[in-house]
Design a protein with these regions (language model features):
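Membrane-interface helix termini and inter-helical loops of multi-pass transporters
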Residues: 45-48, 120-123
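Non-cytosolic membrane-interface motifs at loop->transmembrane helix junctions
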Residues: 121-131
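Hydrophobic cores of alpha-helical transmembrane segments in multi-pass integral membrane proteins
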Residues: 15-43, 51-85, 89-117, 130-131
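Extramembrane terminal tails and long inter-domain/linker segments of multi-pass membrane proteins
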Residues: 1-14, 46-49
């Protein structure tokens, strides 16, 4: 049985989650390349890197590539599989969730630049501790 296409606002939210998933992977790659460049001997002393930039960049890389990507793909698959009921408009809660996820992704991507923060390199999910 072929289901009918969902309404346009629903497709826009699904598209937003797909863009967030791809953007999280791109930022995760950048969050790995830039801290790795901070360990190159020619660049190590030429650029004033923040304190513990490599460790905090590694935390940001893992959080973006593991947590944000998986949750964005989960939202994408869930919204694709579950059709919104006709009597409710899922646009507002769906858009609010997407906006909050984008803001959280930007906060994770900017976390290595926070001064005074300390990277806690745990086994599975590392975190950044800030007083």
């Amino acid at each position: 049985m072929i289901l009918p296409m969902p309404p346009e606002p629903h497709r826009t939210i699904v598209r937003g989650w797909a863009i967030l998933a791809v953007t999280a992977l791109a930022l995760a790659g950048l969050a790995l390349i830039v801290p790795a460049a901070s360990k190159v001997p020619a660049l190590q002393n030429a650029v004033a890197w923040p304190d513990a930039f490599f460790q905090k960049g590694l935390v940001s890389h893992v959080a973006l590539s593991f947590i944000v990507w998986f949750l964005a793909v989960l939202a994408l698959i869930s919204l694709t599989a579950l059709r919104p009921p006709d009597r409710r408009d899922p646009t507002l809660p769906g858009a609010a969730g997407l906006v909050l996820a984008v803001l959280g992704t930007l906060a994770i991507a900017g976390a290595p630049l926070i001064r005074g923060a300390e990277a806690s390199l745990n086994n599975y999910i590392p975190s950044i501790i800030h007083p």
